[in-house]
Amino acid sequence: MQGQKRRVRTCHSCYTRKQKASESDSICDRQYPCNHCTRRRRPEECVYGPPPVKVPSCPPVPADQSETQPRPVESARPTRETPVDDSEAHWSREHSALARSFGYFEDSNSNTMALLRRLELPDQSDTELKNAWPSTWETIHHELDLMPERQIIDFLVQYFVYELNWMKQVIHVPSFLANYQLWWAKDKIVEIADVEFAALIARICSYATQFLPSPSHTVDQIRGRSLADIRDTCSNIGNKLATACETLDWKGTLVRVQHIIFAALKVSCEGRTSQFWEGIGSACRAAQKAGIHTDTTGLESQLAKDSAQELERDVQRRTFCSLYVLDSHLSRQLDRIPFLSNHLIEETLPRLRLIPDIGNIPTETATRAPDIFTERLMQVQLGLFWRGLGLQRTCEFDPTESERIYEKFNSEYLNNLHPAFAIAHPDTTLDKALPKLPMQRQLLYIAIFDSICWNFRPLLLLKPDQVASLAPYKKVLLRSQKRRLGMAALKVLEAVAALHTMFGGSYTRFSAIIFNSFEPAILLLNLCSHADFPFDQDDNSTSLVGTKVRMTYRIAMQAVEQAIHRLQMLADLSDMAASGARVATLLFARSVQPKQSSSPPALTLSVSGSLGPSQFPTPIERYGEQENWPSLEAGDPYSMPDNFPSMAQDSFPSPQLSSLKFPVVWGEAFF
């Protein structure tokens, strides 16, 4: 029977290697990752749905009890023992009490703490911390016992690894999965590092539920437990564990930075951008307290030539880069002051090129293939470019200066993009081998064209008397820049439409899709209200950063209409989408009505309530049919079809030190 599914008793990797559970000498232990995938140092290849366990399923949580304390789950983890003494937990750091009181960075080479280290004074005891120790560990054990059962956590972690991590690249998947299995293997939790990792797991799971249901998982529950219940439980556990960790260890580590970022990303998915900004600020402060922004931490003083240590240090650099991208992008969009300075990121750029394992292709092609982190590096350089200009938005808009910056952007940034991310003719050779590469490409395009919009947006705020006072050549320049602004907004919406299609064209809480559906729509509506806007005539088109863009009133309003449709569809999931849809619809009505009364039927659109279906071919159609989503759970969530598709792989690579001296990261040698 076509579509018949059967239960699989091993992970997909073991199944293909015929290491079935029936073979007594080579048993797949069915954990995530399993013993064989861990031994092969390929934990990211471990893909399967765990079988049902005979435990009573939790009934859906009533709406009036959604905020109540969740019940403990017997199969979450074994009971942990309370640590016997302080030395077991390894929480004491040299002069931690002094650093906590004065706020010193403990790994500094120039502050007073550096002098005290040279004097070799005895450790300072923290009375407040000692008094809080027993009760804090009681809280930790209580929260750990409330974690959802492992099968649920395994599913969410697997979904995150294969479907979500490509977006922000906060963690390095192979090393995370290796630590994930080690964490589950522990008999008891007695170290703060393990509690921090538990907070990371909980917050990753809470974040992952924001993207469910999805085309690969169409139901709103996992193993009989509602997604809302799982989300609230994991969020509460993550928050309480994070608070406990900060109480026990003021300094923190990389893992703390990571789980704070995931907490911020979760509120971003909920449409609370102001809290997202505050969360990024908290992560930036945590990163500096932990010292991951420097190369003078304990890791660097150890065996510098050891590849494992160097990889671990590079993971820190990558997380810091991801944080810088979020900080730069948000500060530019929201007109805020960034938390991280440029010199910090220039000193901590990744030094390893991790070659992806993409199957049977020539070695030469593989070495030119983009790393999974290449898109983030493009985003880092984008932030460095715009922030390096030191622009002051308080100054009056100068068309000449904006034109100079635009030309510089073309020559210094766009001309140095990796071929797979080129604007005009990207190299799509490896799109099938790297399934997330097309999505990363659209994500970068959104950021690039949004930054061009940011460069020219102030021209819309010029008053008539300011425009009248401009020199004639500046008026001509201003007219062409209006056109560029409109074309850039169109390109943002085109990239958003393509990315949304790759997500299945369905409901999503991904803030990049929501935010960047709203902003360019507002820009286009504003531009279309200008009587002197230089629209293209007939079949003419204009070049923008090497690509031809046709800019007419009809095309612009059609793109806006589609953006509003998208916002209306996502309004049920996001307050940001709902409020954006309301404002955009009102502006749309205001823009369309004068045109309808003064011209033949250019657009016949409904602007009250729903806008109705689009009457013109959509930009989405040029991208073809919706991609097939690799199924993690469909029908029977713990069975697997015979023709299980191969998943995207970010395998344990062989680290290679870049021969380039930083901050230069461009060129064939790096990629």
UniProtKB/Swiss-Prot annotation:
One of its GO terms (biological process) is DNA-templated transcription. Residues 77-90 have a biased composition (Basic and acidic residues). GO terms for cellular component: nucleus. Residues 48-90, 629-650 are annotated as: Disordered. InterPro entries: Sec_Metabolite_Reg, Transcription_factor_dom_fun. SMART domains: Fungal_trans. It holds the Pfam family Fungal_trans. Transcription factor; part of the gene cluster that mediates the biosynthesis of the 6-methyl-2-pyrone derivative xylariolide D. May play a role in the regulation of the expression of the highly reducing polyketide synthase xilA and the cytochroe P450 monooxygenase xilC. This is Transcription factor xilB.
